[in-house]
Swiss-Prot record:
Gene name of the record: rpsO
Protein name: Small ribosomal subunit protein uS15
The keyword Hydrolase belongs to this UniProt entry's keyword annotation: no
Source organism of the structure: Staphylococcus haemolyticus (strain JCSC1435)
Biological process annotations from GO: translation
Function: One of the primary rRNA binding proteins, it binds directly to 16S rRNA where it helps nucleate assembly of the platform of the 30S subunit by binding and bridging several RNA helices of the 16S rRNA. Forms an intersubunit bridge (bridge B4) with the 23S rRNA of the 50S subunit in the ribosome.
Amino acid sequence: MAITQERKNEIIKEYRVHETDTGSPEVQIAVLTAEIAALNEHLREHKKDHHSRRGLLKMVGRRRHLLNYLRGKDIQRYRELIKSLGIRR
């Protein structure tokens, strides 16, 4: 259901802004996107798992907030990120 630490580290290496970056909006959005995809797969099998569905909605809301922040801060980085992650906005 959750993503592994190795997968999370791969995502961080791919989307980081500088060498020690783990908390930039790009990294946070990319990690949340992977977690959302994993949780979607879980919910396809377990349709009545409403507790996990609530967690999914919270993750989507957090990602939306970070995307809005990034769009206001740097529109070019925002456009590149949604294109590379395949997020429709």
